[in-house]
Structure formats: structure tokens, C-alpha cells
């Protein structure tokens, strides 16, 4: 179960990166709540990069190349889409403070987006934070069938190519478990995170 660690409206990008390095991440009660609080789950969602699983049906869809997959071309649009309230997601924890913080992290090279495009339409995507050899997945959205799933596949491919060692999903969902996500005890996660933080910051972007 998630354990809030207190509210702090004065969070800077530097404090945010430090928090990630010790196993904390921020959330808001709602999109309308200006405050954010730290979360440290007792069980941490992790998607092992060496045990990532793709279903046959999804693999077939990927071979058909239904979308143009891009990295970091419209980060702000991705986080805005993740923050939208939809019929399947009536509430969201992404408030204006979080959007501003992660936009700054993007501009300094620590937050990244994977995007699915259909022509000039953004139809799916995800975003997260890179630090050391870890990538912390934050949120995803989909406006077309399988768009976010395909973005996740491309994320994992890139992380493997760049020698990342940890893909943190914060929590697990039934959706993520189909890809191989597991619940990792906090102590075990802390050891894995510490090792990832010993690495220099790995490059996620092509630039």
C-alpha cells in the first residue's frame, strides 16, 4: 500500500530528482488540488527488462506499423493528455504543479515521452523520468486501440538498447502484469534502485 510522506508545495526539479533517487515519487489528490505529496509504496511496481512479454496479437499489430512512433517531439502534449479526465479515467493525480515540474525536467534532459502518431494526430503516449540507469514510468494514455501498449514496447526496446537496468512502474496493474510487471518488496527495490543510481545518467534521447 502506498505510504504518503507529507505535503510539500515548494518542490523544485532538483528536489524531485533527489526524491526519485531514494525511492519517492510525487502525486496530487486531484488535478484541482495545487499541493503534491510524496509516495513510497510498500510494494513497488517493476517491469523487468529481461522478462518483458508481448502477446502474439500485439506483436502482430506492431508488425503492421499502425502508428508513427516518436520520442520527445511533444512532451507537453503527452503529459496534458495523460492529465485529461475521460470516461475510463474520471479523475487524475496530475495537477498543474506536476505538469510544470516535469516540463522543466524534460527541458533539462531528465523527462521523456514516447508518442504514437497517426498523421498529425497524437493518438497515444507515455512519459517518465530517466536518472542513472533507471527509468521511472509516470503515466500513459491511448486514443486508439493499442497505442499506449505499442509505446510501452518501444520504450522497453530503447531502454534495453541504452543499457538501462530498471523500469519502475510505481504500481502494478492487470494491464502491466500482462507485460511481465511484478510487485517488488520495498527493501528489494531499494537495493535495485541504489545500484541503478551508481550508474552515470544514461542517454535516452538521440540528441
From Swiss-Prot:
Coiled coil: none annotated. Its EC number is 2.3.2.6. The keyword Acyltransferase applies. InterPro entries: Acyl_CoA_acyltransferase, Leu/Phe-tRNA_Trfase, Leu/Phe-tRNA_Trfase_C. It comes from the Bacteria. Functions in the N-end rule pathway of protein degradation where it conjugates Leu, Phe and, less efficiently, Met from aminoacyl-tRNAs to the N-termini of proteins containing an N-terminal arginine or lysine. Belongs to the L/F-transferase family. This is Leucyl/phenylalanyl-tRNA--protein transferase.
Amino acid at each position: 500500500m502506498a505510504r504518503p510522506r507529507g505535503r510539500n508545495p515548494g518542490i523544485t526539479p532538483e528536489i524531485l530528482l533527489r526524491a526519485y533517487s531514494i525511492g519517492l515519487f510525487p502525486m496530487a489528490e486531484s488535478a484541482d488540488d495545487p499541493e503534491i505529496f510524496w509516495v513510497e509504496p510498500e510494494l513497488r511496481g517493476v517491469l523487468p527488462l529481461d522478462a518483458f512479454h508481448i502477446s502474439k496479437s500485439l506483436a502482430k499489430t506492431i508488425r503492421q506499423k499502425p502508428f508513427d512512433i516518436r520520442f520527445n517531439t511533444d512532451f507537453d502534449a503527452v503529459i496534458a493528455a495523460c492529465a485529461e479526465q475521460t470516461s475510463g479515467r474520471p479523475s487524475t493525480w496530475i495537477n498543474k504543479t506536476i505538469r510544470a515540474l516535469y516540463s522543466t525536467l524534460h527541458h533539462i534532459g531528465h523527462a521523456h515521452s514516447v508518442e504514437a502518431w497517426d498523421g498529425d494526430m497524437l493518438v497515444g503516449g507515455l512519459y517518465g523520468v530517466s536518472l542513472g540507469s533507471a527509468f521511472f514510468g509516470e503515466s500513459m494514455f491511448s486514443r486508439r486501440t493499442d497505442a499506449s501498449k505499442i509505446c510501452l514496447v518501444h520504450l522497453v526496446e530503447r531502454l534495453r538498447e541504452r543499457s538501462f537496468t530498471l523500469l519502475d512502474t510505481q504500481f502494478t496493474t492487470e494491464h502491466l502484469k500482462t507485460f511481465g510487471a511484478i510487485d517488488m518488496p520495498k527493501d528489494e527495490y531499494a537495493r535495485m534502485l541504489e545500484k541503478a543510481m551508481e550508474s552515470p545518467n544514461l542517454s535516452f534521447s538521440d540528441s
